[in-house]
Design a protein with these regions (language model features):
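Conserved P-loop NTP-binding catalytic core
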Residues: 45
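NTP/phosphate- and nucleic-acid-binding module
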Residues: 1-42, 50, 56-596
Length: 596
């Protein structure tokens, strides 16, 4: 595959860069198509991404419809058929600025002003379209073989919510039609697994713009799953000596100034509220409250490690374009804990956290994950607490502990929390890009900021080390992950309805009611479908919509024999004694058997 660089030379594209170049060229072709259809369009940035490409564009008051996106894609195909040569050229600063001003590319002009040290700028031209770009690109538009516009969303200029909201148009591009077809098949699977779709079908949660974007509400079925997850992780934590607390969802601005969140995390926080001369803010995380709980009384080295846990409600001002059901919202519940320990206890505490993470993943059959040591970017003084010695000590300590524990990890710069490095455990869901579920963060910063101490063996006051950790992460996100992994077919212990009783006719309704009552007494979540519908309809509803683990199909034969006909998710049917069936289900519930 031939590509052209900004200096004009043509060469074979390195194989590992082919998709990037294809997608970057697709972004330019899409921008050209947009400009043809909307001459007043003003373009911002249009890069290739891991999975495709996008262009952020200012369309004034124009709101694009699905039909408009289809027309843009149609125009892109015209441009590829025109087989326009893609040619680079370079201009000195003054001429480059003049060119962009003449073409009314205001965002490009502003971007050039930001690049104050640059004396010249490179451009690529195809037909009438010119874009400021460093390349490389395909040599002709016809070389772009397979692409598709996928969606539009909003994006702030320079990712700053104080700036104008632009229209972001996304697309994908591949080497050939076969790859595009395979991608579309994957997308169909993604749509079928989407937790928002399944959540609506199963009545797990809902959203409403009147309540607010990014503020999902759990319905009875969904809250049942949520509570089971809460019970599961609390049991695990109690067995390890955790002490559970409950703290308020708000705090004073001064609390977050003390912690450093106000300086380093304010853009992700909701605006402050003024009450009786005091400023309050919804909390984005729980560390400051837990620091204050530790500070509530004096501590000795004998008290440590002290493990404080909470299922805590948090609020973050996520941009509207990033919101996604319960996977990412503006309100969520964090499986949070803070472990206060001595420096000598760091290794054993990190080891215990890691063991709990991996034990939990085994319980939920999570196998596709990777560990990342997230470090600060030393050049970013705004994002991170400015103490080089503290950072070097913390990063080296966590790196050494992970190495000693034999945990394979990669390192990523710029992904640390503002107060310390962290171990992130990223999962690869059934569909979509990986994201972080679990985390363990090492912190020498906040204990000092809150003047936390303990009396050591020698009688002197020392500052404890804090481990911030989340095993399930956000319960909301963890639930979204499980929904998409299982397609809503939760294991018996998690299922909102564990058994559905289906009388074949009204004649067996009384027997069905008796069986239902017996299951309820055994602690099983059961629902009786007494609608006057054909049994086939009831089975489909229970299996495809409610996705229950077990159905009891009760006809005259079962009523006469006093047993039950059991149908599982696979469609296999067996006849069992009632007590035998109850023993089977209660065993799965008690042992939290992962049988989806």
């Amino acid at each position: 595959m031939k590509i052209i660089y900004k200096d004009g030379h043509v060469d074979e594209c390195p194989q590992d860069q082919e998709l990037h170049v294809i997608r970057h060229t697709a972004a330019h072709v899409m921008a050209q198509a947009i400009k043809r259809l909307y001459p007043e369009a003003d373009f911002a940035f249009g890069p290739a991404t891991e999975n495709g490409f996008y262009y952020d564009v200012d369309l004034g008051d124009t709101k694009l419809t699905d039909e408009d996106l289809a027309n843009i894609e149609k125009e892109m195909h015209k441009i590829t058929k025109e087989n326009l040569a893609i040619k680079p050229f370079i201009l000195p600063r003054a001429e480059a600025v003049k060119l962009m001003e003449e073409r009314h590319e205001n965002y490009k002009v502003e971007h050039m002003a930001d690049l104050a040290d640059e004396t010249e700028f490179s451009f690529f031209q195809q037909g009438e379209y010119v874009d400021m770009c460093i390349g490389p690109h395909l040599t002709y538009t016809k070389a772009l073989k397979a692409f598709k516009i996928t969606q539009q969303s909003g994006a702030y200029w320079k990712n700053d919510k104080e700036n104008k909201m632009l229209t972001r148009i996304n697309g994908v591009a591949f080497h050939n039609q076969e790859e595009l077809d395979a991608w579309e098949k994957e997308q169909q699977e993604a749509r079928e697994r989407d937790h928002r779709k399944i959540g609506k079908e199963m009545g797990l949660f809902m959203t409403d713009d009147l309540v607010g974007r990014g503020l999902p509400m759990f319905l009875p079925a969904g809250y049942t799953v949520w509570q089971e997850l809460e019970n599961y992780i609390k049991e695990k934590e109690r067995a390890r000596g955790y002490l559970h607390v409950m703290t308020p969802c708000i705090g004073t601005v001064n609390l977050y100034k003390t912690s450093g969140h106000w300086d380093h995390y304010r853009e992700n926080m909701f605006p402050a509220m003024e009450m009786e001369g005091e400023s309050y803010v919804l909390r984005p995380m729980n560390c400051p409250h837990h620091m204050m709980i530790y500070a509530n009384r004096p501590h000795s080295y004998r008290d440590l490690p002290m493990r404080i846990g909470e299922i805590a409600h948090d609020f973050r001002y996520e941009s509207s374009g990033t919101l996604k059901g319960i996977e990412r919202g503006r309100h969520f519940c964090q499986n949070d804990a803070h472990l206060f320990c001595t420096p000598e206890q760091i290794k054993s505490e990190v080891a215990d956290v890691c063991n709990l993470i991996f034990e939990t993943y085994k319980d939920f059959n999570i196998t596709d994950y990777r560990c990342v040591l997230s470090l600060r970017d030393p050049a970013d003084k705004k994002k991170y607490h400015d103490d080089d010695a503290m950072w070097n000590h913390a990063e080296n300590a966590l790196r050494e502990v992970l190495t000693e524990l034999g945990i394979h990890f990669t390192e990523e710069i710029g992904e640390a929390a503002f107060y310390g490095p962290k171990l992130d455990v990223n999962v690869k869901p059934a569909v979509g890009a990986e994201y972080t579920l679990s985390t363990c963060q090492l912190d020498f910063c906040l204990p000092a900021k809150f003047h936390l101490t303990y009396v050591d063996k020698d009688g002197t006051e020392k500052t404890p080390v804090v481990l911030h950790r989340a095993i399930l992460g956000s319960l909301d996100r963890f639930m979204a992950y499980l929904i998409e992994e299982t397609k809503g077919k939760f294991p018996t212990w998690l299922a909102p309805v564990q058994v559905k009783v289906l009388p074949v006719s009204e004649k067996t309704l009384e027997y069905s009611e008796a069986i239902t009552e017996k299951l309820v007494e055994a602690g099983i979540r059961v629902a009786l479908d007494d609608d006057n519908q054909k049994i086939g309809y009831k089975i489909r509803a229970a299996q495809q919509v409610d996705r229950v683990p077990y159905m009891l199909i009760l006809g005259a034969k079962e009523a006469e024999a006093g047993n039950v006909s059991v149908r599982d998710r696979k469609g296999e049917t067996t006849t069992m004694e009632v007590d035998e069936f109850i023993a089977k289900v209660t065993s799965e519930i008690k042992n939290r058997t992962y049988n989806n």
